[in-house]
Amino acid sequence: MMKYLDPKADLTFKKIFGNHPQRLISLLNALLPLSEAEQIHAIEYLPTELVPQLEGGKNTIVDVLCTDSRGRKFCVEMQMEWSDAFQQRVLFNASKLYVSQAKKGGKYSELQPVYSLNLINDVFEHDTPDFIHNYRIVHDKDSNKVIEGLHFTFIELPKFTPHSIADKRMMVLWLRFLTEINSNTKEIPADLLNDPEIGKAVEELEISGFTDAELRAYDKFWDSVSVERTLLDDRYQKGREEGKEEGIAEGMEKGMEQGMKQGMEKGMEQGMSQRSLEIAKKMLA
């Protein structure tokens, strides 16, 4: 029986999408909010290390980076855990890609859009069932007024359900590929194998195609994910406990303040009543 690796791991994700242009084009066209006229037809891979323009700036590395025949840039990230720091890194990397296009003496009008596709194996928007979140720079009162340049797509993989986007066949197939295949998979659904690019991607996930060193790196990746998840859970639990303690302390303090205030008011009322009684007695004497 054939065994498979999980496509979401760093090793497998880069192997599947980092050196196969047509496969990456299929993924991008399926998951990004591109109109028919905006579809990608050809790409060229770019180095995944983003070097800063200024000396002393911060170098960053992304999973997959490419440009198309129009000069548009596409940055793809597979992230196992959500954090505010990751969100800021996404913004930082996309901005750096946009700025890096500027050439000395060049025109700003020649700058091409940057699309950032982020696949998150975590839930970060808990108050909505929507799992695809597209962002761009729009007017706060009229969303039809757009400043072109930066486009962000975040997909919460755990929320994905095929029936919710049944009309988008390729999106469904690629998201099923990312969410349904793992080390426990015994049989690959026929509709995944029937698509040429996804079928080839499935073949590359066969465990027999990896070296012992690659398999060790694969296992190490999941160990690090487990450790990171534990640390995040511990921080979350600690934050809840601290918040609870602060809430109790604040409640006690507020209760004491109210008690003292009520006591003082009651004491003043009693004191005034006693004083009025004494005055009345003197007047009757």
Predicted segments — roles?
Residues 1-285:
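Elongated, amphipathic alpha-helical interaction scaffolds
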